[in-house]
Amino acid sequence: MEQARPIRRALLSVSDKTGILEFAKALNERGVALLSTGGTAKLLGDAGLPVTEVSDYTGFPEMMDGRVKTLHPKVHGGILGRRDQDDAIMAQHNIYPIDMVVVNLYPFAATVAKAGCSLADAVENIDIGGPTMVRSAAKNHKDVAIVVKAADYARVIAEMDANGNSLKLATRFDLAIAAFEHTAAYDGMIANYFGTMVPSYGDNKEGDAESRFPRTFNSQFIKKQDMRYGENSHQAAAFYAEEHATPGSVSSAIQLQGKALSYNNIADTDAALECVKEFSEPACVIVKHANPCGVAIGDDLLTAYDRAYQTDPTSAFGGIIAFNRELDGATAAAIVARQFVEVIIAPSVSQEARDVVAAKQNVRLLECGQWTAPAQGFDLKRVNGGLLIQERDFGMVTQGDLKVVSKRQPTEAELKDLLFCWKVAKFVKSNAIVYAKEGQTIGVGAGQMSRVYSAKIAGIKAEDEGLTVAGSVMASDAFFPFRDGIDAAAAAGISCVIQPGGSMRDQEVIDAADEHGMTMVFTNMRHFRH
């Protein structure tokens, strides 16, 4: 068979031993000779498989506590040797061709993620022989198959069975790509880890501002889907995800029905889901163009959805809806009967809800899984020729963090609304103003160049939907540079304001609140969002 290569000898040396015994048995049953090292060789030998230790094959023992195992010409000559072209020199040095290499690498990421991991621990989990064999086999994919993922074991055996114990070039090439991706990610993790130690060059990174970010930033994402287009129809696009995306994210979500997700669908769904995660009560967030246009909590999801929708039914048309509880049939029925929706996402979806939404085949229904702790990692923003990297904004305040700076004190009900409103403001594009009352947004002013106009827009939105502003609270994602935003809020009927404070004119702004008989609370925390 043209470009197919028979598999007669395989070298197996894996850190993650998932499925390796079954794979080795399958290879042995097909007449493949097995070479192996260390723990892998012991596992295979204990299972009764005929296996040759690499040290017996090379005539050179493992040494230096296993640091040197496979770095030998008889190993790499067998992997890198070009069939036909190098046969004579291989025979001269008694080098056997190695047709398949099965390797995955020391668990560096898992090691450095452990509490108390020392530099010495990290160093000992830097694989040397493994990546060298992987790269050698991938380089010589014309003749050699390299397998780095347990998920590929079954398809390798299936193809061998279909092709007389041979693998096609297309398969070997695909496996080689996976191998280079594997070593690239591995080296990137190591570079990131050591890069955070500059300039301390040691275990103790406390107090080093530079240590939060490595000298070079390496990250790897796996393509999840190609898209019809990007943000606009003239832009090509694709969606990439982290290899181990955490549950409770758009990247890990399973699509239960509907059209393929678009670029804008994914961006908006992420915004809605991250916002709804802030609430412990049953909550609903409706997003349009990455901005919450309606957010509410309730005793149940249906109540939360009804109240979120009431904020701005006009903007909710064609929006994204996120929940923090299992989507039930009653809530799904209300959505389908009431509005056109692009995406619905929830931790889980009941069978009744699935059946209801199935009546609208184009609606994208996503089940994201339940989240626990906030996802770690960085926020990344591409700029022309560069990349901005920052810690994710996990900042939030509790009632005990608030500082009342006005003469009037907030009531308990107002304090609850202030904290609710503050959570929403964190996810609104700056300049952000949010009006809320009794756990429901009643007006959102987003993305304006001046804060006072965001305040005016929030009031207009509430008025247009017939919602009562009187007695409501207002959140601002950043400080008020002038009193005009407070005057606009007072004119609309706002009774309490929550904001970071920190302006040169704070006293002027506080005085304005006192003049209007309003409560003002400082958080000492800003939530810009661009």
From Swiss-Prot:
One of its GO terms (biological process) is 'de novo' IMP biosynthetic process. Residues 1-148 form the MGS-like domain. One of its GO terms (cellular component) is cytosol. The keyword Hydrolase applies. The keyword Plastid does not apply. Coiled coil: none annotated. Its EC number is 2.1.2.3, 3.5.4.10. It catalyses: (6R)-10-formyltetrahydrofolate + 5-amino-1-(5-phospho-beta-D-ribosyl)imidazole-4-carboxamide = 5-formamido-1-(5-phospho-D-ribosyl)imidazole-4-carboxamide + (6S)-5,6,7,8-tetrahydrofolate; IMP + H2O = 5-formamido-1-(5-phospho-D-ribosyl)imidazole-4-carboxamide. InterPro entries: AICAR_Tfase_dup_dom_sf, Cytidine_deaminase-like, MGS-like_dom, MGS-like_dom_sf, PurH-like. One of its GO terms (molecular function) is phosphoribosylaminoimidazolecarboxamide formyltransferase activity. The IMP cyclohydrolase activity resides in the N-terminal region. PANTHER family: BIFUNCTIONAL PURINE BIOSYNTHESIS PROTEIN ATIC, BIFUNCTIONAL PURINE BIOSYNTHESIS PROTEIN PURH. Belongs to the PurH family. This is Bifunctional purine biosynthesis protein PurH.
